[in-house]
């Protein structure tokens, strides 16, 4: 999922636990085939990658940010950190956990070539410190912590897709049906993301809210010859649609005929 637009840009219905660690490399190649370059930065959960894969990302020049599993030896290392080594970082967010304490250091991993930057962060509302590892040695500790924290927003959007499109309950064990479900879910998510950006006051609306208030509106479809008119019936939230930026669109696969909306 794209961190800025929160649009789901990649999905794989055939992913299993056995091959999930390499999927980040598959995505990197997919992104390069579309854009001509590897993604500049990948923020990921530690469960979907390995140290060897992180090394390969570094070799390809891709910046990564992920968590490190808290092993017994790592917890012992954290316990031995002197009090004077911790420094306070002020995060740009509201709430009780906006001033965590951080230890910024270099460390080695058993299956990672060279060293990696490690941020040990205490005071984020968890019992044990959060340990972030990255090959980004340019950004400040504050920037890296905030960047990783935005992953929670992405997970929230995925939870919305699960709730709205039942993304975790695909239709069938038949691969064709599953792939179709995933493609339709990606398209539906993109359509909802585009719609909410056009509706005043609904920039953060969830797909199920859009469905209830706008998409389930009844109406009539009129074939005008050189275009199609969709006339929607009046509802409580019709004024929001009237003021929305929904332009008349020429549809290529309709031979250039237009699609436009009107409201009773």
Regions found by a protein language model. Give the residues of each.
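Short, solvent-exposed helix-loop connector elements
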Residues: 141-148, 164-180, 195-207, 226-234
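An anionic, glycine-rich sequence signature occurring as long contiguous blocks
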Residues: 55, 60-157, 161-166, 249-264
């Amino acid at each position: 999922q794209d961190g800025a637009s929160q649009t789901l840009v990649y999905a794989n219905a055939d992913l299993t636990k056995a091959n999930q660690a390499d999927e980040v490399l598959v995505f990197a190649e997919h992104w390069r085939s579309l854009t001509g370059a590897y993604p500049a930065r990948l923020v990921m959960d530690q469960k979907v990658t390995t140290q060897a894969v992180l090394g390969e990302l570094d070799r390809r020049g891709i910046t990564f940010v992920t968590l490190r599993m808290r092993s017994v030896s790592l917890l012992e290392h954290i316990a031995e950190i002197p009090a004077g080594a911790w420094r306070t970082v002020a995060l740009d967010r509201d709430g009780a956990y906006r001033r965590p304490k951080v230890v910024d250091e270099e460390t080695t991993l058993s299956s990672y070539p060279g060293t990696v930057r490690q941020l040990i962060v205490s005071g984020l509302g968890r019992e044990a410190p959060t340990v972030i590892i990255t090959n980004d040695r340019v950004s400040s500790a504050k920037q890296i912590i905030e960047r990783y924290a935005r992953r929670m927003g992405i997970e929230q959007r995925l939870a919305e897709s699960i709730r709205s499109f039942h993304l975790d309950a695909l239709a069938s064990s038949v691969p064709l049906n599953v792939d179709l479900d995933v493609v339709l879910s990606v398209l539906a998510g993109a359509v909802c993301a585009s719609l909410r950006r056009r509706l005043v006051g609904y920039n953060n609306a969830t797909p199920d809210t859009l469905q209830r208030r706008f998409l389930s509106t009844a109406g009539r479809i009129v074939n005008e010859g050189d275009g199609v008119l969709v006339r929607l019936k009046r509802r409580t939230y019709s004024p929001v649609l009237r003021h929305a930026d929904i332009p008349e669109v020429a549809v290529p696969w309709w031979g250039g005929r237009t699609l436009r909306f009107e409201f009773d």
